[in-house]
């Protein structure tokens, strides 16, 4: 399975990931100059926290959002392992929002459904990784992610 890896040392806080996620995934028009005037406003599924750290769904192996959802709206794609929202059955109870350990799941602008990163599963490749100018967001194999995550920081010898 592939996961999104964010290198906080490469992220410059430009918010391109948010901008394009909101435009390409959440807007009706799919055009930036029109999307900013849409009602309800398009809500991106990835967020830049503080100055330079993009946050997105981790697609947890034991996803609390799936367990908490009372009617099966939060689902896992059996082929990709991605957790996604099946919007037609969402009752806006916000149980998934409350239990997400990363604070990634949010109500939509209309407050009718929950929204979260599904890694652009209908596009084939996450738009946030595609548009990141510094390649701070990358799609990598889970094993490579674990290797990188546990690499000791580089040291300077004096």
Whereabouts are the PLM-identified features?
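Flanking helices and flexible, charged tails adjoining ferredoxin-like Fe-S electron-transfer domains
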Residues: 1, 5-7, 22, 27-68, ...
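N-terminal signal-anchor transmembrane alpha helix
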Residues: 12, 18-22
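Glycine-/small-residue-rich active-site loops that bind phosphorylated ligands and cofactors
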Residues: 12-13, 124
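A short, small-residue-rich loop immediately preceding and capping a beta-strand
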Residues: 72
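Membrane-helix interface segments
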Residues: 80-81
